């Protein structure tokens, strides 16, 4: 999920990819920050105010990084209205690999469950919940028993 710490050399481009970080858009960022910080132990590493609210926040846990930007901030940041509207087309779907699905389920208690705990054909035990902005977060552990 999120930030990948490995470096990948692309064929024929001469470009090295060093990290991928999702930017998730929300009406209000504060509940999303609390979702990740309070439940899953992420740290807020950066924030940019937008009036009396947050316009942007960066969250990190180990090598995993997430960014949230408010719709209002995106509207100001991207001057093209058509592009700014793309932020509202969501939700985004995240796939988060964890080492203890049962501890993760406990931490996620109270979040709306989109897909109950299941074992997949590809060997993952997973559950999907919604974050406060409506983005779907699938937590998965490979090799676990449901």
Feature locations, PLM:
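Short acidic-aromatic low-complexity motifs
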Residues: 26-30
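Short glycine-/small-residue motifs
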Residues: 136-139
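Vicinal oxygen chelate
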Residues: 2-23, 43-97, 103-130, 141-146
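Conserved active-site tyrosine of GNAT-family acetyltransferases
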Residues: 32-37, 108, 134
């Amino acid at each position: 999920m999120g930030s990948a710490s490995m470096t990948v050399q692309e064929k024929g481009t001469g470009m090295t990819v060093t990290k991928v970080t999702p930017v998730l858009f929300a009406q209000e960022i504060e509940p999303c920050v609390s979702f990740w910080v309070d439940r899953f132990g992420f740290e807020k590493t950066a924030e940019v105010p937008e009036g009396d609210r947050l316009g942007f926040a960066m969250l990190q846990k180990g090598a995993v990084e997430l960014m949230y930007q408010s719709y209002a901030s995106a509207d100001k940041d991207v001057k093209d209205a058509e592009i700014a509207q793309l932020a509202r087309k969501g939700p985004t779907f995240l796939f988060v690999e964890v080492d203890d699905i049962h501890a993760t389920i406990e931490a996620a208690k109270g979040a709306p469950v989109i897909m109950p705990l299941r074992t997949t054909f590809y060997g993952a035990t997973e559950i999907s919940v919604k974050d406060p902005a409506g983005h779907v977060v699938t937590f998965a552990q490979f090799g676990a028993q449901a």
